[in-house]
A protein has these predicted regions:
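GH16 jelly-roll
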Residues: 1-264
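C-terminal outer-membrane/trafficking sorting elements
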Residues: 268-350
Length: 350
């Protein structure tokens, strides 16, 4: 079953309860960071992308670039020949070079407009056999949909104010019954945070923390739940044959992509007698540093990610709170001097 027009009362877990394990903040301007992303451009057999899509995906900067801290994925109307095929539209399809199992994903994005545009923020099993995909040559063992597909956000220009989430598994795929969505009147005029929480039990989909779909099959097996293995992220705009003749180009603008996990790569360091804990992470206006008695009196220095020292604090109690409201958004380092040396931690200011 699926839900379309009502909301679950379930609420996503506050990301403060998670640790940030991977992100791209798309700082600066220029090319997409190739350490984080792979441009998938190889056409499937048959010479066209699935679902009747009519675009070429390219690795050119005109189709994907960073400008003033925003990733722009651009679908364009232009004649372009690649792999022996000439098409009239181009776009970009990015695969993350990071795969993970379970956690919370947040993507802050503004969507394109126009009938025939099909932007998506989604995930595929790292084990997918897909010629041209980033992970296929090293991890590919399963075809689609046995690998599992998680659509965090899909949007069709023909239904401008509606966004959808969906699941594709061997039990239901393509026109899957496992889907739900909500109306977002500002989907193309303002950024929204598209989120999913993925655990061993269920998937919770939301926009700006308003839940619109929960996938929690009563029976979990390879047919209904191929989701106990790592998945990776994809960002793209597809073009449908129904694209308007007046279309010239459209952009999906992405402010950030963040992946959080519980108890993984934590900013928590603990031995039998020593504890240092930074929270929340990400932080907004205040950073808390909780320490065991061993560290009371120690210095905590905050540095920019480039190594510039910004502040020095004394940890004068077990619970210490420091004002970071004047810091710009981004990553920072905290170095704490102890008898055993210097311990370094990273946090994100939002």
């Amino acid at each position: 079953a699926y839900i379309d027009d009502f909301f679950r009362t379930e609420t996503p877990t506050n990301p403060v309860n998670y640790n940030l394990v991977w992100s791209d903040e798309f700082d600066g301007s220029g090319a997409v960071n190739s350490t984080n992303w792979y441009h998938q451009t190889k056409l499937p057999s048959g010479g066209s992308w699935h679902n009747g899509e009519i675009q070429h995906y390219t690795n050119r900067q005109v189709n994907s670039y960073i400008s003033n801290g925003i990733l722009n994925i651009i679908a364009k109307k232009e004649t372009f020949t690649d792999q022996g095929k000439t098409k009239q539209y181009t776009s970009a399809r990015l695969n993350s070079k990071f795969a993970f199992k379970y956690g919370r994903v947040e993507v802050r994005a503004k969507l394109p407009t126009g009938v025939g545009t099909w932007p998506a923020i989604w995930m595929l099993g790292q084990n997918i056999l897909e010629s041209g995909g980033y992970w296929s040559s090293t991890h590919g063992t399963a075809s689609w949909p046995a690998c599992g597909e998680i659509d965090i956000m899909e949007h069709w220009g023909s239904n401008q104010n509606y966004v959808q989430s969906a699941m594709h598994t061997p039990s239901s795929f393509g026109g899957t019954v496992n889907r739900g969505g909500q109306n977002i009147s500002t989907a193309s005029s303002q950024c929204q945070i598209y989120g999913i929480e993925w655990s061993a039990e269920k998937m919770i989909f939301s926009v700006d923390n308003v839940v619109h779909y929960v996938y929690n099959p009563a029976v979990k097996n390879a047919s209904t739940w191929p989701f106990n293995a790592p998945q990776y992220l994809l960002l793209n705009i597809a073009i449908e044959p129904s694209i308007s003749s007046n279309f010239t180009q459209g952009a999906m603008e992405i402010d950030y992509v963040r992946v959080y996990q519980e108890n993984a790569l934590s900013v928590h360091n603990s031995t039998k007698n020593e504890t240092i804990f930074l929270f929340p992470n990400p932080a907004i206006n205040q950073l808390n540093i909780k320490v065991s008695d061993d560290f009371i009196g120690s210095q905590a220095k905050i540095y920019s990610i480039l190594g510039q020292e910004l502040a020095t604090h004394i940890l004068d109690s077990q619970q210490n709170t420091f004002d970071i409201s004047t810091y710009q958004n981004g990553f920072y380092l905290v170095k704490i001097k102890t008898l055993k040396g210097i311990k370094t931690y990273k946090f994100l200011k939002n």
